[in-house]
């Protein structure tokens, strides 16, 4: 991976065990004002769990499978503003749907972003058409590309609910970033009712850029794993990164980090102004006898986040199992 300006001056402000009761990675954690949410893949279904901080996060409230499924690391609150009919938006969340086998990827990625309303859409769903949704994510922004080359697709919302990020990866290499006004996105979805899609190619955006060396295993790539995206109120973009540990009788733990793309340095030519939080050298997330896998990032403010981390260890049969999912509140400078 490419060397960036690094910091290890990290502070753990709080932490807690999600205690989901199920041995699987929490791919996305979200700490809300009332509840804590977790996204796990359970028997092929994207499952959203909910609970209170300090207790078990183990109540399944949403299960997406079939055409409503697909690998996703997106679970983002849609904001606190009223909809186009003057109704409260509380209860609406963004999540990835519609599985798609992509050339060059072993993962069945979600290719659309749906908006789910927990007030009336909890429980199991089998079709992406159960929800209003954003489609043609590969056509977002100023640099569209072929849909069969889209190997990641995620969404994020800024803490003040003004900015909406679509982040995709083309051909397991090129990172595409498009920032929208969140009100614009929500209003377009409101206009579509309960089950139609919005073609992102037709939606006005605020900024769009690509990083052609974002992802890969070579020394010129920024990250070798993308576990989560988020952005702060100023438009700084953050990426959490760590591959799952290799397991072949022994473990090999991969480098863990958070990469920050400043709002004033959104180009490959400005990568010398990017920052990396070196969590491996920091060491504060390491637990004896367990091997970490950094998962999602939830930005609270600039250089301040909740970070979800899964931990793996061997059981008595020598099998690799996920044995713990922690959420850490971190800050750094």
From Swiss-Prot:
Keywords: Antibiotic, Antimicrobial, Bacteriocin. The keyword Hydrolase does not apply. InterPro entries: Helveticin_J (IPR035280). Transmembrane segments: none annotated. Pfam families: Helveticin_J. GO terms for biological process: defense response to bacterium; killing of cells of another organism. It comes from the Bacteria. This heat-sensitive bacteriocin inhibits the growth of closely related Lactobacillus species. This is Bacteriocin helveticin-J. It comes from Lactobacillus helveticus (Lactobacillus suntoryeus).
């Amino acid at each position: 991976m490419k060397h960036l300006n690094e910091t290890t001056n990290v502070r753990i402000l709080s932490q807690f065990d999600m205690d989901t009761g199920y041995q699987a990675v929490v791919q996305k954690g979200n700490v809300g004002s009332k509840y804590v949410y977790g996204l796990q893949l359970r028997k092929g279904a994207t499952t959203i769990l909910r609970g209170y901080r300090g207790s078990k996060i183990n109540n399944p409230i949403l299960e997406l499978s079939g055409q409503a499924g697909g690998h996703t690391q997106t679970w983002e609150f849609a904001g606190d503003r009223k909809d186009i009919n003057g109704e409260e938006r509380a209860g609406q969340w963004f999540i990835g749907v519609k599985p798609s086998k992509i050339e060059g990827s072993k993962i069945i990625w979600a290719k659309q972003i749906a908006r789910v309303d927990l007030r009336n859409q909890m429980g199991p769903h089998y079709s992406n058409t159960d929800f209003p949704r954003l489609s043609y994510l590969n056509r977002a922004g100023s640099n569209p590309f072929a849909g069969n080359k889209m190997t990641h697709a995620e969404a994020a919302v800024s803490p003040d609910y003004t900015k909406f990020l679509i982040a995709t990866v083309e051909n397991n290499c090129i990172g595409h970033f498009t920032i929208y006004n969140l009100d614009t996105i929500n209003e377009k979805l409101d206009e579509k009712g309960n089950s139609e899609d919005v073609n992102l190619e037709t939606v006005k955006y605020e900024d769009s850029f690509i990083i052609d060396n974002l992802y890969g295993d070579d020394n010129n790539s920024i990250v070798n794993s993308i576990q989560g995206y988020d952005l702060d109120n100023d438009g700084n973009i953050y990426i959490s990164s760590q591959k799952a540990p290799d397991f072949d009788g022994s473990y090999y733990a991969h480098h863990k980090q958070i990469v920050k793309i400043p709002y004033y340095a959104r180009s490959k030519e400005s990568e010398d102004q990017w920052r990396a939080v070196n969590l491996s050298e920091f060491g504060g997330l390491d637990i004896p006898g367990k091997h970490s896998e950094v998962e999602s990032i939830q930005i609270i403010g600039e250089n301040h986040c909740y970070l979800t981390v899964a931990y793996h260890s061997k059981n008595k049969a020598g099998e690799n199992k996920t044995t713990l999912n922690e959420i850490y509140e971190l800050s750094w400078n």
